[in-house]
Amino acid sequence: MDGMIAMLPAPLQKLSSHIDFQGQKVAERTYQVILTIAGIIGFLVGFWTQQLSYAMFTVLGASAFTALIILPPWPFLFRKNPIVWHTPAEPQESGDKKKETKKTK
């Protein structure tokens, strides 16, 4: 992903493309709700007009709308809870290495 971001123009490289775990949960739930409602509405529109194309266009339009909402990492939706990483621990010698150093002396 970093390689793809490096190919973008300089102003776009400054934009963050990461979302947190809570943001992923919100994005997934939003995606499910919108597409489920769109499927029901698309079915009803297609049934009422007896046109399968109207049902398909309704669902495709809702899919495009969902992509517009979900794909950008909006800071007010998907980046409210930043991840705090632990600092890396110092490497410690294992018990086997300590025994080997004692034997060589």
From Swiss-Prot:
Protein location: Endoplasmic reticulum membrane
Keywords, comma-separated and alphabetical: Endoplasmic reticulum, Membrane, Transmembrane, Transmembrane helix
Membrane topology: Multi-pass membrane protein
Cited InterPro entries: Spc1/SPCS1
GO biological process, one term: IRE1-mediated unfolded protein response
Record-annotated membrane-spanning stretches: 33-53, 57-77
KW Transmembrane (keyword) present: yes
A Pfam family it matches: SPC12
Cytoplasmic topological segments: 1-32, 78-105
Regions of this protein lying in the Lumenal compartment: 54-56
An annotated GO cellular component: signal peptidase complex
Similarity-based family: Belongs to the SPCS1 family.
Subunit structure: Component of the signal peptidase complex (SPC) composed of a catalytic subunit sec-11 and three accessory subunits spcs-1, spcs-2 and spcs-3. The complex induces a local thinning of the ER membrane which is used to measure the length of the signal peptide (SP) h-region of protein substrates. This ensures the selectivity of the complex towards h-regions shorter than 18-20 amino acids.
Function per UniProt: Component of the signal peptidase complex (SPC) which catalyzes the cleavage of N-terminal signal sequences from nascent proteins as they are translocated into the lumen of the endoplasmic reticulum. Dispensable for SPC enzymatic activity.
Protein name listed in UniProt: Signal peptidase complex subunit 1
Organism per entry: Caenorhabditis elegans
